[in-house]
Amino acid sequence: MIAAILTTLFFAFSAVTGQRVAVMLGGAWGNLMRLGLAAVVLGILVAILTPDAIRWPSFQWFFLSGLIGFGLGDVALFTAYERIGSRLTILLNLCLAPLFAMVLEWLWLGNGLGPRVVVCALLILAGVAMAIRPGSKSRAKVALRGRYWVGIVAAIIAGFGQGTGAVVSRKAEAVALELGASGSGITAAFQRVLAGLLFSAIAVILVRFFGSRKNWESWRSPLDRKVVPWLLGAALFGPVIGVSCFQWALQDLESGIVLAVVALTPIAMLPLARITEGDHPSRLALVGAVVAVAGVVLLNLWA
């Protein structure tokens, strides 16, 4: 249980540091720097711990999963960070991801959707509908930029990437197991991050050469003293330390219990977002967050 709790906390820290990186560097550029640093750290760990665990048949599936999850999902995630903040972005992302995953498994694998699943889905959607109400801007410590509705759509796309990428990743794990090449969570994360890094690099190129000037002219150096601590936190807390704790938790507990605990991340990060961003959600938004997270917890326990 300690590992699951640590996973929740590290994912929460990853969110608030990632949001600051998105604001300081810009969503596309900041995400590329974060994934680049994470890829270097994960690559070193894989070379030391599991150098023989990467096989081409499973790599293809992990790479596809990474394109969807770390690629499309994280580009959208950082786009949302700089528009609606970390609290609402993570709430939409983590609460909607299981719904997208269930729909894909239903269409692709033929898994049924029972009445309990439908009830949980309705709870999640009702909570999200209440939670998207903007909080007070007068006490914000970090100035958001961009249109609010664009951030909402981006967070929903991030949830799609997260959920769909997770389903494809499970397929990759099954292929790796058949090959006898099942490595650690770090090995899987490295293969997925590589794909996300490629997708993010393409996104940066498109923004730089085809986007409006205001979207890239404010990009700062990742070596800026004010940026480095936040960038290190965003790169390490999530893809490296958070994933490692997540795999540790799965070794000790049933996956449903682990996912139920991790689903509390949007609640755990409320005080963090308040401290780092000055985020003060409305009472309705708080109630909505609790309802949505409760739906996800029940879904993971019942599914």
Language model segments and positions:
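Structural signature of hydrophobic alpha-helical transmembrane segments
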Residues: M1-F11, R55-F70, G114-A126, T187-L198, ...
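Membrane-interface interhelical linkers
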Residues: M1-F13, T17-W29, M33-L64, V75-I84, ...
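Juxtamembrane helix-start motifs in multi-pass secondary transporters
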Residues: G30-N31, T89, A188
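Alpha-helical transmembrane segments of compact multi-pass small-molecule transporters, enriched
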Residues: L37-L42, L92-L107, L122, A195, ...
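Hydrophobic/small/kink-forming positions within alpha-helical transmembrane segments
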Residues: A12, V16, G43, L67-G71, ...
